[in-house]
Amino acid sequence: MKKPFEVIAIIGKPRDQQAIQTHRELYQWLSTEGYQVFVDDRLATILDDIPQEHFSSLIELGKRADLAIVVGGDGNMLGAARILSRFDISVIGVNRGNLGFLTDLNPENFQSALTDVLKGEFMEEERFLLETEIHRHGQIKSHNAALNEAVLHPGQVAHMIEFEVYIDDSFAFSQRSDGLIVSTPTGSTAYSLSGGGPILSSSLNAISLVPMFPHTLSSRPLVVDGKRRIKLIVSPDNRGTQEVSCDGQISLPVSPGDEIHIYQSPNVLKLIHPKDYNYYHVLRNKLGWSSKLF
């Protein structure tokens, strides 16, 4: 009987010793189980007991592996997702971070849960990403993707900025605020939630627009269909340089008068979970949301 996964990638970056030990234990255990295992080359100097030919770049891992195991917190998963979503590869996480909303597996007993996953006992869901383009004088000046959110904000100095929002080229609203969070369902439990945005079920094909400290009494978050294209036109009268932040990890400079185009990526992240995964249990467990009264 053919295994669901033959080639497995272990992904992470140098962190604390506990995380490094988890990488090492994963490699040894998977190799013993007969899998072909490759490791993120950012760990090559730390894990010097692993043969050098077993290290590859993130792009090469995406091409070669059937399954990627991301060790770390949600930040590691977000960084890996922007690249791995380009390839036909399933992804699961071992939590070595703080919240671990996207990384399901407990590092203390990952073998038990992974054994079932490697037998094919798992559930899979596709999480879409957002593509963000900065247009200046009719040309694309910069571009990146985000699994959680794309955020227009003033940059290093907090002050209000002015911009207009268009949905499928139809004017929606204008705003003076500290910025705007454009979030996927995956990101709805992250920065968007802190900004007062709605929690979107992870399977929804929807995008939320959450104003940041709007200078009005009537502004509210807006949820639109996931296939809609969002265009933000930054006022030419804004002071200084603004930015668009992708997942809080990539910054794209924005000048007054620029257009920001945000739309659903054609790529998806194939995220897998153990069979007993329950989204609402994660909400309660990680966010302390709506515990049962009786």
UniProtKB/Swiss-Prot annotation:
InterPro entries in alphabetical order: ATP-NAD_kinase_N, ATP-NAD_kinase_PpnK-typ_C, NAD/diacylglycerol_kinase_sf, NADK
Catalytic residues as annotated in Swiss-Prot or TrEMBL: 74 (proton acceptor)
Gene Ontology cellular component list: cytoplasm
UniProt keywords, alphabetically: ATP-binding, Cytoplasm, Kinase, NAD, NADP, Nucleotide-binding, Transferase
GO molecular function: ATP binding; metal ion binding; NAD binding; NAD+ kinase activity
Reaction(s) catalysed (UniProt annotation): NAD(+) + ATP = ADP + NADP(+) + H(+)
Gene Ontology biological-process entries: NAD metabolic process; NADP biosynthetic process
Pfam (any one): NAD_kinase
Coiled coil: none
Requisite cofactors: a divalent metal cation
Places the protein is found: Cytoplasm
Residues annotated for NAD(+) binding in this entry: 74-75, 148-149, 159, 176, 178, 189-194, 249
Membrane spanning residue stretches: none
EC number from the UniProt entry: 2.7.1.23
Disulphide-bonded residues: none
Function: Involved in the regulation of the intracellular balance of NAD and NADP, and is a key enzyme in the biosynthesis of NADP. Catalyzes specifically the phosphorylation on 2'-hydroxyl of the adenosine moiety of NAD to yield NADP.
Family classification: Belongs to the NAD kinase family.
Protein name, per record: NAD kinase
Gene name of this polypeptide: nadK
